[in-house]
Amino acid sequence: MTVTDDYLANNVDYASGFKGPLPMPPSKHIAIVACMDARLDVYRMLGIKEGEAHVIRNAGCVVTDDVIRSLAISQRLLGTREIILLHHTDCGMLTFTDDDFKRAIQDETGIRPTWSPESYPDAVEDVRQSLRRIEVNPFVTKHTSLRGFVFDVATGKLNEVTP
């Protein structure tokens, strides 16, 4: 059996008690951008219930064009008005450089990626960079609150980053 098979079995239990359908717009009108790290249980750490928030995840909580696309849809079509960014301590993005990563892929495949992994040496500074990317973006302008945090994987606490 695979892990996917285990998860499918879990879904049977989940579906048996499912209370749907929920409205499409998130009830708390908030979008959260977070790192994909498996140690971050965004729903539990913030006490989010189903249907309350959009949660957008990628490697490093990097504000990429695709994150901007998702935030623009979240705001303009589904009414979100707050944005939270969630980086964390001990992030894998702190452990390599873009050039080394791209070179390793090229050595293995013969093709150098055209995209950037956007690694960074400092999570706090990257939160600031991410906040600035959103602040200056002409497509993501409908928010009344934009805040960034670093989650401490050792303590479970969120530390707010000042811009």
Swiss-Prot record:
Its cofactor is Zn(2+). Pfam families: Pro_CA. The keyword Cell wall biogenesis/degradation does not apply. CDD domains: beta_CA_cladeD. One of its GO terms (molecular function) is zinc ion binding. Its EC number is 4.2.1.1. Inhibited by sulfonamides and sulfamates. The best inhibitors are 3-bromosulfanilamide and indisulam. Zn(2+) binds at residues 35, 37, 88, 91. The modification N-acetylthreonine is found at residue 2. It catalyses: hydrogencarbonate + H(+) = CO2 + H2O. GO terms for cellular component: plasma membrane. Keywords: Acetylation, Lyase, Metal-binding, Zinc. Binds 1 zinc ion per subunit. Homotetramer. Was identified as a high-confidence drug target. Catalyzes the reversible hydration of carbon dioxide to form bicarbonate. Belongs to the beta-class carbonic anhydrase family. This is Beta-carbonic anhydrase 1. The lineage of its organism: Bacteria, Bacillati, Actinomycetota, Actinomycetes, Mycobacteriales. The gene is mtcA1.
